Amino acid sequence: MDLIYIPEDLSSCPKFGNKSCPPTNRSFRVRMIMYLFMTGAMVITIFGNLVIIISISHFKQLHSPTNFLILSMATTDFLLGFVIMPYSMVRSVESCWYFGDSFCKFHASFDMMLSLTSIFHLCSIAIDRFYAVCDPLHYTTTMTVSMIKRLLAFCWAAPALFSFGLVLSEANVSGMQSYEILVACFNFCALTFNKFWGTILFTTCFFTPGSIMVGIYGKIFIVSRRHARALSDMPANTKGAVGKNLSKKKDRKAAKTLGIVMGVFLACWLPCFLAVLIDPYLDYSTPIIVLDLLVWLGYFNSTCNPLIHGFFYPWFRKALQFIVSGKIFRSNSDTANLFPEAH
């Protein structure tokens, strides 16, 4: 999600001429290093999430409610890497927007939409894991295909309506005279918020769902510990039978992994959303380099997700081998066993 630094003194703005770019003080070497680093993050984001999308879509063994939510979230991360990050990279390195005002509004709207969509997906995944671990007897009747479809529709539609409605109406910059002058003078494109909408965005779109996720995973952790303790107290000859009803090890492991995904998300996006909340009350005095770093820290979350899957999910590594080796193109490859340890 884009942020903006608005200088207090805009009297020097006209000397650049209307819709010009202020000169950058970054050397060629610094710009090349920035391009290399950002391009690397972008490539990992695009291809890593593409592997997740292909794997869950192709292999029937991965067709589960949780994985369909993960597939949709990977699509969000893929779009961020493919559509948003390239243009943000040029803007961050060159300190200028070369792509026009109309595309600027689309870019800002789509950027915010994807950020919020990720949050909503994580909330949905947390709910799914809650029922799987804490109420397994009712999981299959609660998290049905129709329920997953409704969750996915909400995860995409609500952020889209909110983001595009807010940016296109320009309600987020209402009353910000400095912003209007800056846009008139420079080839400039960044998403910023006045005090009202900055507070609304942080409270309703980050703090509230973030608190819900933390609460749900806290409950999952407590229940998992209780199950593990109960299993350890069982006689050896009854552990196997009781374990199937008391707790599913795979579900607990999945909940733990997705909890790590949630933790990384909060760590990456919390500083950015705090800037959205606080910067308007500081008269937008946060240096532009700091805001750029916060934005790219948020983007980096989409880079981390496939790396987390690769580290914690054996099926991801197995599916990657199928894709890289070309075995995925063989007949009946969609029925391949990605969990050999389960047999």
Swiss-Prot record:
It is a multi-pass membrane protein. One of its GO terms (molecular function) is trace-amine receptor activity. SUPFAM superfamilies: Family A G protein-coupled receptor-like. Residues 57-68, 169-172, 224-257, 309-343 are cytoplasmic. Gene3D superfamilies: Rhodopsin 7-helix transmembrane proteins. Disulfide bonds join 21-185, 104-189. One of its GO terms (cellular component) is plasma membrane. Its main location: membrane. Specifically expressed in neurons of the olfactory epithelium. Disruption phenotype: Mice lacking Taar3 show decreased sensitivity to isoamylamine. Mice lacking Taar2, Taar3, Taar4, Taar5, Taar6, Taar7a, Taar7b, Taar7d, Taar7e, Taar7f, Taar8a, Taar8b, Taar8c and Taar9 show no visible phenotype or behavioral deficits. They however show an absence of aversion to low concentrations of amines such as 2-phenylethylamine, isopentylamine, N-methylpiperidine and cadaverine. The keyword Disulfide bond applies. The chain crosses the membrane at residues 36-56, 69-89, 151-168, 173-193, 199-223, 258-278, 288-308. Residues 1-35, 90-150, 194-198, 279-287 are extracellular. The keyword Transmembrane helix applies. Glycans are attached at residues 18, 25. It holds the Pfam family 7tm_1. Olfactory receptor activated by several primary trace amines, including isoamylamine. Activated by isoamylamine and cyclohexylamine, but not to the corresponding alcohols, isoamylalcohol and cyclohexanol. This receptor is probably mediated by the G(s)-class of G-proteins which activate adenylate cyclase. Belongs to the G-protein coupled receptor 1 family. In addition to the well known disulfide bond common to G-protein coupled receptor 1 family, trace amine-associated receptors (TAARs) contain an unique disulfide bond (Cys-21-Cys-185) connecting the N-terminus to the extracellular Loop 2 (ECL2), which is required for agonist-induced receptor activation. This is Trace amine-associated receptor 3. It comes from Mus musculus. The lineage of its organism: Eukaryota, Metazoa, Chordata, Craniata, Vertebrata. The gene is Taar3.
